[in-house]
Amino acid sequence: MSHSQEKIALITGASSQGDIGTAICRKLASQGIHIFFTHWNSDTAWIEEFQQEILRMGVRCEAMKIDLSDAHAAFTIHEKISDKLGYPSILINNAAHSASDNYVSLDAKSLDEHYAVNMRSNFLLCVEFARRFKKSNLISGRIINMTSGQDLGPLPGELAYAATKGAISAFTRSLSQELAPLGITVNAVNPGPTDSTWMTDEIRNFLSPKFPMGRIGTPDDAARMIAFLASDEAEWITGQIIHSEGGFIRG
């Protein structure tokens, strides 16, 4: 990605102080990248405060509250970012829907809810990004999706989540081939279990012994990997599912 090219990043799912999306916004802003983030079910006062925090880093920042389960969300988001900041050269699909279900509880409603956010929204954001990128004067771009290690082992009790996240890996690999001629790299990151807003003390105590490095991953760990993939140095990396989870031991 050319250093003379103004960089604008679109990040979905930055909805609370301690989540991965928020850490990604901070990391990219610290590198001089303008930020557009989406959120949902967030405290309005916190969103405004966080936006001001990013602005104090010397970059532009816009936020948008949107329900990604809406079939028109991808188009709406790209229209808004183009109007407010310009064409993004970086897309990070961080938002996800997750609800526990097993063979007893899984139903059409749960499948549809997971599909709408984890697959449809993600995929449409990617292709809308690429279509607009092709019409722009941007030289190279980055798409970074998020997976959950479903390639490395089973996730019992998370059937819809595991299936829809697994689809992201397949989509990432295929899309990378299509977009390579445009100068867009497409990768996915599995950050492993991350000590963010979802993790309770019970879960934390259960997972801690499974990390040989002596600690659970943090949102900043994920943000550093994503920032690297969004950088100029990662221009030769595409079609990869990167497991950045501190040697996490499954089973």
Swiss-Prot record:
Sequence positions that bind NADP(+): 12-21
InterPro entries noted in UniProt: NAD(P)-bd_dom_sf (IPR036291), Sc_DH/Rdtase_CS (IPR020904), SDR_fam (IPR002347)
Organism domain of life: Bacteria
Record protein name field: Uncharacterized oxidoreductase YjdA
Binding, substrate: 148
Family: Belongs to the short-chain dehydrogenases/reductases (SDR) family.
Record's keyword annotation contains Oxidoreductase: yes
Source organism per UniProt: Bacillus subtilis (strain 168)
Active site per UniProt: 161
EC number: 1.-.-.-
Keywords carried by this UniProt record: Oxidoreductase
GO molecular function annotations of the record: oxidoreductase activity, acting on CH-OH group of donors
Record NCBIfam families: PRK12748.1 (NF009389)
A Pfam family it matches: adh_short_C2
